[in-house]
């Protein structure tokens, strides 16, 4: 496969695109990157790192499905590498624009434009599968997760972004 000069591989077949440019656009990617860089979700990132460090072997294979601009993916990659457990790590997202941003964040990760419902990976390849705030594709996740592997799923709670909702809807 050809790797784009930005550092990602495009693996989304035309029949899996439901719009001309699926997923987040360049402006959304920049806004999310700026927001996350302010540390608002650092506690979540640190918690994920602790969970993964406690469950991973020496060189785990980790897939972040719906990785967005790579905030969690890159943070976990760096934490594992610093702990002497360098992972083989991949992040997928349906948005080409957002993966351009992700690839700039960390070059040691394999980034691919792909659907979480049709992941372009072999059966049973992942020791750990991560899904943070992305669509849940359970059948596909079961397919790619190794027997005995770990699935970490992050979903927003009822009060997620409550302060913002109050401003918008009052």
Task: Provide a role label for each language-model segment.
Residues 1-21:
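N-terminal auxiliary segments of SAM/dcSAM-dependent transferases
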Residues 138-150:
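A short glycine-rich, Lys/Arg-flanked "PGG" loop and its adjoining helix->strand segment in the class I
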Residues 117-129:
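A short acidic, Gly/Pro-enriched loop at the edge of an enzyme's catalytic core
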């Amino acid at each position: 496969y050809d790797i784009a000069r930005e550092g990602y591989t495009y693996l989304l077949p035309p029949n899996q695109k439901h719009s001309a440019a699926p997923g987040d656009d360049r402006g959304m990617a920049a806004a999310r990157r700026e927001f996350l860089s302010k540390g608002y979700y650092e506690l979540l990132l640190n918690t994920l790192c602790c969970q993964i460090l406690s469950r991973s072997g020496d060189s785990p294979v980790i897939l972040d499905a719906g990785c967005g601009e790579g905030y969690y993916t890159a943070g976990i990659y760096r934490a594992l590498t610093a702990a002497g457990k360098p992972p083989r790590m991949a992040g997928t997202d349906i948005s080409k624009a957002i993966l351009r941003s992700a690839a700039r964040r960390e070059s040691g990760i394999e980034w691919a434009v792909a659907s979480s419902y049709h992941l372009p990976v072999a059966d049973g390849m992942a020791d750990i599968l991560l899904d943070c705030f992305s669509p849940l594709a359970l059948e596909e996740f079961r397919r790619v997760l190794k027997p005995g592997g770990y699935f970490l799923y992050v979903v927003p709670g009822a009060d997620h972004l409550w302060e913002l909702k109050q401003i918008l809807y009052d």
